[in-house]
Amino acid sequence: GGIPAGDVEKGKTIFKQRCAQCHTVDKGGPHKTGPNLHGIFGRATGQAAGFAYTDANKSKGITWTKDTLYEYLENPKKYIPGTKMVFAGLKNEKQRANLIAYLEQETK
């Protein structure tokens, strides 16, 4: 099964509620508790310049795509054991798809 079609506006709401306290998405945006996410699609884990990642994130060695984000966001600590991201994950497939649709648009 592929990823369901996502709704950007609904994804924006999820981002504001669940992600924005630790992450920014705009180009040149600051790192907060978590790294700025601009340009995340096609980038390897643990590679945003100037952010202090855990070794787990640096050594995971995958590239962020819709598919890897979809799996990661369901259960971050299972996907990258040792990550310091405290987010428990989004179990709802549609919510993950919406969030990814928003990220795809906003991090370019």
Swiss-Prot record:
Molecular function terms from GO: electron transfer activity; heme binding; metal ion binding
GO cellular component, one term: mitochondrial intermembrane space
Protein name as annotated: Cytochrome c
Subcellular location: Mitochondrion intermembrane space
Family affiliation: Belongs to the cytochrome c family.
UniProt entry tagged with the keyword Electron transport: yes
Organism (species): Eisenia fetida (Red wiggler worm)
Binding residues for heme c: C19, C22, H23, M85
Origin organism lineage: Eukaryota, Metazoa, Spiralia, Lophotrochozoa, Annelida
Broad class of where this protein is predominantly found: mitochondrion
